[in-house]
From Swiss-Prot:
Protein name: 5-oxoprolinase subunit A
Leader sequence residues: none
Organism: Cutibacterium acnes (strain DSM 16379 / KPA171202) (Propionibacterium acnes)
Role of this protein: Catalyzes the cleavage of 5-oxoproline to form L-glutamate coupled to the hydrolysis of ATP to ADP and inorganic phosphate.
CDD domains: LamB_YcsF_like (cd10787)
Keyword ATP-binding: yes
Keywords: ATP-binding, Hydrolase, Nucleotide-binding
Classification of source organism: Bacteria, Bacillati, Actinomycetota, Actinomycetes, Propionibacteriales
EC code(s) of this entry: 3.5.2.9
Highest taxon of the lineage: Bacteria
Assembly notes: Forms a complex composed of PxpA, PxpB and PxpC.
Gene Ontology biological process terms from the UniProt entry: carbohydrate metabolic process
Gene3D superfamilies linked: Glycoside hydrolase/deacetylase
GO molecular function: 5-oxoprolinase (ATP-hydrolyzing) activity; ATP binding
UniProt-listed PANTHER family: 5-OXOPROLINASE SUBUNIT A, UNCHARACTERIZED PROTEIN YBGL-RELATED
Length: 256
């Protein structure tokens, strides 16, 4: 039986600001990308999210970011690579400690937003992220993988460093012909119809391709499928994807 992981971003509330319906999504997905306080989330929310994920048997990943609360991590920051490495280590260490308190572990790392897109091609920043993961793995005996865009430079560097890699596709995002994501600033970058998105995911998993924004077919490999938790109708979207995969005989299972 074919299997695939379904992941979603969670723990993105902080202080009095609330985002997403994490509790509902945890009943649907198999992996949770938990914000680590740099683009969203705080100590309380991180704890609540890890506890709930553990109770639902959902795999926990660290959703690390540039230090950009004001911009929700969507702004590129030309940060010194050494500082970026240390800030990723900081985020990983915080989430690992909080997860451990709730009887869980952090199994993978998924960079967020602008950082995610930048390390597809930015040598110095991609290297810094890989070094951070490898440093924590080496110091603690952990075996965290990195989850990223297929063909991304960061995945190549991770493999060279001996860090496990996982590739993902986005259920509700449009793709360019080169396999990169269409900028959110461009019209049509985010898909909103649950039925359309669900069919698209089945094609991705069974045929290994996605239709780009210009209509061309792009070969793409996916260990995991991301459904965004902060978009309108996120729960309905995730439910439609899960149900359509199940009806096709595809089993949902955490990749990490």
């Amino acid at each position: 039986m074919a299997t695939v992981d379904l992941n979603a971003d969670m723990g993105e509330s902080f202080g009095s600001w609330k985002a997403g319906d994490d509790e509902s999504l945890l009943g649907i997905v198999t992996s949770a990308n938990v914000a680590c306080g740099f683009h969203a989330g705080d100590a309380v929310v991180m704890g609540q999210t890890c506890k709930a994920a553990a109770e639902h048997g959902v795999c926990i990943g660290a959703h690390v970011s540039y230090r950009d609360l004001a911009g929700f991590g969507r702004n590129f920051i030309d940060v010194d690579p050494g500082r970026l490495r240390d800030e990723v280590i900081y985020q990983l260490s915080a989430l690992r400690g909080i997860a451990a308190v709730h009887g869980a572990s952090v199994r993978y790392v998924k960079p967020h937003g602008a950082l995610y897109n930048t390390i597809v091609h930015h040598q110095a920043q991609a290297k810094a992220v890989v070094e951070a993961i490898d440093a924590v793995n080496s110091a603690t005996g952990a075996d965290m993988a990195i989850l990223g865009l297929p063909g991304a430079l960061v995945l190549d560097l991770a493999e060279q460093q001996g860090v496990r890699t996982l590739s993902e596709v986005f259920a509700d995002r449009a793709y360019n012909p080169d396999g990169t994501l269409v900028s959110r600033r461009q019209e049509g970058s985010v898909l909103h119809d649950p039925g359309e998105v669900a069919e698209r995911v089945v094609t991705l998993v069974t045929q290994g391709s996605v239709t780009a924004i210009d209509g061309t077919k792009v070969p793409i490999k996916a260990d995991s499928v991301c459904v965004h938790g902060d978009t309108p109708g996120a729960v309905a979207m995730a439910t439609a994807v899960r149900d359509r995969l199940a009806s096709t005989g595809i089993e949902l299972r955490a990749a990490a």
